[in-house]
């Protein structure tokens, strides 16, 4: 009898307690637009290189926002895809205000995550809790296609500031412009250890 009451109580909690979203989530959900996107659909952008960088210091390839505040209206997460050409690297960085998940669809990468370094392959999932240093280098023979998710917005604003829409001419950033963008978005990403 006691277990039957417990099961009923748990079910009632799940149905009544968890089914009700906090008012902020309800408001966000009302403003968000459901999306169904194919691989090539989304907001395509290209990173701007830093002026004076050598060609082999190239930034990662193009990326595409799929879901964020500007695409679908989500105010609680960022979901995007990015290509990492052979030899390219996502520099060592951390995100103070958000967890990050990266899923590598293919290829081979060397990952420095926190205090660990490991070689990973297509199908690997990387989880970087907020404030965890991460660096990803494509050490394979093919372009890596990756997917990343942030648990909170912020880094997407930095990415837009350091990139241009996919078909727009790419003009390098000066070192001063890059420094100003990084300072403005320090709440979202830090590229240099203190």
Show the residue positions of the predicted features.
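Positively charged n-region of N-terminal signal peptides that target proteins for export
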Residues: 1-4
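Bacterial N-terminal signal peptides
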Residues: 8-19
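A short, N-terminal "cap"/entry segment at the start of jelly-roll beta-barrel domains
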Residues: 21-76, 164-194
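Conserved short histidine dyad/triad with adjacent acidic residue
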Residues: 63-68, 80-95
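Ligand-binding loop in jelly-roll beta-barrel domains
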Residues: 73-74, 110, 130-156
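Glycine- and acidic-residue-biased ligand/ion/polar-headgroup-sensing regions
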Residues: 97-109, 114
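Short acidic-glycine-tyrosine-enriched beta hairpin
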Residues: 115-131
